[in-house]
Amino acid sequence: MIKWLFKYGAVIFLFNTVLLAIESTKAIGDQVFLVLMAVFAIALLINPQQIKNVLFHKAFSFLLILNLLNVFYFLIFHSINDIEAIKYLLARGIQFSIISVAIFFNYEYYKTKFLDHLVYVIVFIVFVGLLFNADLFSGRYGGLIWNSNMLASFTSLAFAILFLNEKQKTRFEVFLLLLLFVISISTGSRGVLLAIALAFLFKYGFSKRNIFYSFLALSVYFLIVNIQLDTSINRFASQSLFNDRFLQYQYAYETIFKQPFFGFGLDKYAYIDPSVIPYSLRGYNISAHNGYLAILTQYGLIFGSIILFIIFRKTVQVSTWFKQSFETERAYLFIIISALFVSVYETMITGINEFHTILFWFGLAFLSYTKFTTDHEN
């Protein structure tokens, strides 16, 4: 049982975010998360020698350093009575442990099958959503998912994973690509356009084919913006990517400089100080909507800069190495790079139970482990 949990704990952890994203199953998702955290923590404690070999593995050293930074920050700026900070500290530590252990004990599965299974689960969610709500263009489409942006995250990543697969596409897979593309656009998420463009860039680079696709996309763009819909293209044309973000960036910036050096604490990720929000806007759900500002708000400029340095350094390492490798799944690198772009306008890479954030950390750890094992074999 424990061996199975070590191998597939990351799968449960990731797919549970789907339950959390569906209003009718959110309560179940909350319970699954708590049980997984508790059981995995016990499994770690009763297998100290095995876990030591994993957590101290050179490929996962960047995750260990981030965990140690969290512990160090907690000891300096928090007390044992800060329950929410303790929850974040433990959840982040177990999250990184789940990822590291899964890759170490089940590497071949995550290299050859996991991404396919991920696409299948998302496609299943899409099909079930269409059974209950097939009206794609009456507004921002959400299907089963309570938040249209979350559905866009699911479908655009599934589209990219399937699109970047080098295997010859079957007719059914071509149909799935078209379906995922249409669903992604119908969500009204402007970030979908960036994700799809990035996927084409990963696939074809700056080639003649991509130039042709760019002209084709531009033609479709001008066609759709003249139709009264609420798709990603229409919203991008009328609002731009950052239209409703600048004010929230301003509040995040003002919040950071209230405690610039050491931040507001581990329990204050995506935090905005209420005192900087105008009275007329209080009561609305306002957050940084920027992963980098969220980290600086949480940790301050000193610890936050160290964390961002570790993230970007590891990203550069695996990206540079990947250019020389034809074996590693390109989709993992896409997940990492797209998350860094998305973090400019969404609170990404800092939370615990967010789909793309989990995949981001998993992708970094997976490519780091792939790089280590390949270099070691050579």
Predicted regions and their residues:
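Transmembrane alpha-helices of multi-pass inner-membrane enzymes
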Residues: 37-42, 333-378
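A membrane-periplasm/extracellular boundary helix in multi-pass inner-membrane enzymes
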Residues: 186-187, 204-240, 253-258, 266
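A juxtamembrane structural motif centered on a specific transmembrane helix
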Residues: 1-5, 49, 164-169, 361-378
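Interfacial loop-to-transmembrane-helix boundary motif in multi-pass membrane proteins
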Residues: 5-8, 54-67, 93, 100-128, ...
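Aromatic-anchored transmembrane helix interface
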Residues: 32-37, 59-72, 81-104
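Long extracytoplasmic/lumenal interhelical loops at the membrane interface
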Residues: 142, 235-250, 254-258, 262-299
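Alpha-helical transmembrane segments of multi-pass inner-membrane proteins
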Residues: 102-105, 109-137, 146-206, 313
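Hydrophobic transmembrane alpha-helices and their immediate junctions
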Residues: 57-61, 170-172, 204, 208-215, ...
